[in-house]
């Protein structure tokens, strides 16, 4: 289907004329993270993290993972770092102010 189907070839033509790339990627996508590439049923995501527009069916499964704080490894790492920074809260003493 990927190489022989004329419908697949016809669907790949509009991707050649894209004005902008609207599928988001992070610098961590591809190396070290391969989660989206493993989840892509079409295998349109290269090992380096680039999405092949000619093969992508725009199912947006990779984008669901990209924006999921509980699934995307770079977002999980950022959340853990934020949690470590906020782990030691500083207590501010309260002072009662009178209406005098």
From Swiss-Prot:
Annotated transmembrane regions: none
UniProt xrefs under InterPro entries: NosR_regulator
Major localisation: membrane
Cystine pairings recorded for this chain: none
Signal peptide: none
One Gene Ontology cellular component annotation held by this UniProt entry: plasma membrane
One MF term in the entry's GO annotations: DNA binding
Domain of life: Bacteria
Membrane topology: Peripheral membrane protein
Species: Pseudomonas aeruginosa
Name of this chain's protein: Regulatory protein NosR
Function, as annotated: Transcriptional activator of the nitrous-oxide reductase gene NosZ.
Location relative to the cell: Cell membrane
Keywords, comma-separated and alphabetical: Activator, Cell membrane, DNA-binding, Membrane, Transcription, Transcription regulation
């Amino acid at each position: 289907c990927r190489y022989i189907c004329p419908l697949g070839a016809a669907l790949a033509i509009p991707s050649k004329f894209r004005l902008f790339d609207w599928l988001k990627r992070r610098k961590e996508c591809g190396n070290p993270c391969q989660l989206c590439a493993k989840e892509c049923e079409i295998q349109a995501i290269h090992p380096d993290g680039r999405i092949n527009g000619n093969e992508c069916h725009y199912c947006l499964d990779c984008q669901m993972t990209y924006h999921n704080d509980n699934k995307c490894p770079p977002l999980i790492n950022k959340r853990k770092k934020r949690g470590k920074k906020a782990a030691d809260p500083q207590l501010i003493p309260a002072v009662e102010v009178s209406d005098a």
